[in-house]
Design a protein with these regions (language model features):
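Single, function-defining residue in the core of a domain
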Residues: 1-171
C-alpha cells in the first residue's frame, strides 16, 4: 500500500500488530515517517532488542538487518541493537530471497527510536518511530499517538452508522 501511494510526505500511525521490519522498511524507503504502538513483553520488535529495564525510556537504534546466518553475523548479533537476523521464511522485501554461499552477506539498514512513556498512573505505552528526537520529544509523541484514537473512534462510529459491525482491518 505504501509503495503504490503518490503522497510525497506522510506520517503513518498504527497500532500493535502492524509492527514488522518489512512495514517499517517500506515506509523508510518512501521517506515517510512512522509511529507505531508496539507490544511490550517477549513478542514483537522490542523483544529482540536491548532496552533499558525502566518504566520510561527513549532509545535510538540503528539496525543492520540480514537474512543470512554466518559466523560473522553471529558475532554481530552478540552486540546489542546492532544487527537483526530475519529468517528467509519471514517476509522482508529488501533482501534477496535466495543466494549462494559464496555471495557476500547483504544488510538493510533501518533507524528508529523505541520510546516508552507513561499514559496514566499505572500504564505505559511503547512506540517505535523514525521521527527525530530533537524535533519530536516524548511530549510531542504522546500527542501524535493520542490523535490515533480520534481516527479509531471515528472509524468505529462510521462502522456502526453503516451497519458494518463485522468489518475488521487486516494486516
Amino acid at each position: 500500500m505504501v509503495d503504490r501511494s503518490d503522497i510525497p510526505k506522510a506520517l503513518v500511525l498504527a497500532d500493535r500488530n502492524y509492527e514488522s521490519y518489512n512495514n517499517l522498511a517500506h515506509i523508510q524507503q518512501k521517506n515517510w515517517a512512522f509511529l507505531f504502538r508496539i507490544k511490550d513483553g517477549k513478542t514483537g520488535i522490542g523483544a529482540g532488542l536491548a532496552l533499558p529495564d525502566s518504566d520510561e525510556f527513549d532509545v535510538p537504534i540503528h539496525l543492520k538487518i540480514t537474512n543470512r546466518m554466518t559466523n560473522d553475523v553471529k558475532k554481530l548479533l552478540q552486540i546489542g541493537n546492532c544487527c537483526k537476523y530475519i529468517p528467509r521464511r519471514n517476509r522482508f522485501d529488501f533482501l534477496p530471497k535466495k543466494c549462494d554461499r559464496s555471495d557476500p552477506v547483504q544488510f538493510y539498514e533501518l533507524s528508529f527510536r523505541i520510546v516508552r512513556f507513561k499514559i496514566s498512573d499505572d500504564s505505559f505505552e511503547t512506540i517505535i518511530t523514525n521521527l527525530e528526537q530533537q524535533s519530536f520529544p516524548v511530549s510531542e509523541l504522546k500527542q501524535l499517538y493520542a490523535m490515533r484514537w480520534g481516527i479509531e473512534t471515528s472509524f468505529r462510529d462510521l462502522k456502526y452508522t453503516l451497519g458494518l459491525l463485522h468489518l475488521h482491518s487486516k494486516k
